[in-house]
């Protein structure tokens, strides 16, 4: 098992930042699109909200998979990547719970 150079580690971190910025921008665009359908008044609004929710879920899964792949490459351990995904999921749920009252 070879050790990675500092430059290679920085390139992996750069890739993580680049890919996660794209995913975060997609989530922001989906939230902005969903904000135009709130409050829900008719059936098409329910359809739009449900489709945007599914798209947001797919983007979040894509982000977790990208982070998992790069963390496994960076640390050479699957457990660190799994613990990071669990930790970030808990943080996201706490943030979502904090903003829940503002959206409803």
Curated annotation (Swiss-Prot):
Keywords in alphabetical order: Plasmid
Protein name: Protein ArtA
Source organism, top-level taxon: Bacteria
